[in-house]
Amino acid sequence: MKMSNKKRNADKKPLMYIVQPDYAETTRSSMQEIVIKRKADKPAPPKAEEKPAYHEKQQEEAVAQDVLQEDQKPAAEPVSQQTQEAREPENIKSQEEQKAEPQAVEETVEHEPPKAEKKEEPALEARKPEKEPEAVHSADKAEEKAPPARKVKKPMSKMTIHEKIDFLTKLPHNMPRALCLIEANGRTYRGVIVGRRNDSVLLRTTGNGAPTELAIDDITSLHPLGF
């Protein structure tokens, strides 16, 4: 019976198939119960634990950059030292030039004043003669512009003998001569003063004779009549 069943099954199988072993039907008695206890899944680690790894990477990168910078610094320092050494003589020269400039200026200032004084002296001497004529002209102009002093008219009674003689001798010709009473050398004269000659007065008396000459210093009193 078993052989016939196998042949039948072989006849029914397709050309392409997966060979499977023949096995007997299992009964419950032949089965074993196997209990498998699954372990509880551990909770995922918090993200905070992952951060240290990230930070560690950053720190490693920063350390690597610092190392590179330190390696580059020694190469750059000689260059900077060379530039500083090259600049030091230039700075020293510039400082020396700056110090020399004020000294030169001070020397020029110290030497210049005597020249200026020497130049000013002839200039003043040349100007002096120019100013003197100007002063003369200004004085002349002032005299021309100055108004003539007004003569104060005195009454005849307050005039001196000299003032009376000047007044009577300078009267206009169209005015009549005043008759005067003159005392000189102890004598009294009555007449008209015609003129003046040096320090003497020409007096014409009432007579028709020549005028009498009297010294002004000898006249003790002079009284014009009619004033």
Curated annotation (Swiss-Prot):
Pfam families reported for this sequence: Spore_coat_CotO
Protein name: Spore coat protein O
Subcellular location, record wording: Spore coat
InterPro entries referenced in this protein's UniProt entry, alphabetically: Spore_coat_CotO
Taxonomic placement: Bacteria, Bacillati, Bacillota, Bacilli, Bacillales
Purpose of the protein: Has an important morphogenetic role. Involved in the assembly of at least five coat proteins, including CotB, CotG, CotS, CotSA and CotW. Required for appearance of a morphologically normal outer coat. To a large degree, CotO and CotH act at a late stage of coat assembly from within the outer coat to direct maturation of this structure.
Chief location category: other
Basic and acidic residues: bias regions: 35-60, 85-100, 108-147
Additional free-text comment from the UniProt record: Largely but not entirely controlled by CotE.
Ranges of biased composition (kind: Basic residues): 1-10
Gene Ontology BP annotations: sporulation resulting in formation of a cellular spore
Chain residue ranges for the region called Disordered: 1-157
Key words of the record: Sporulation
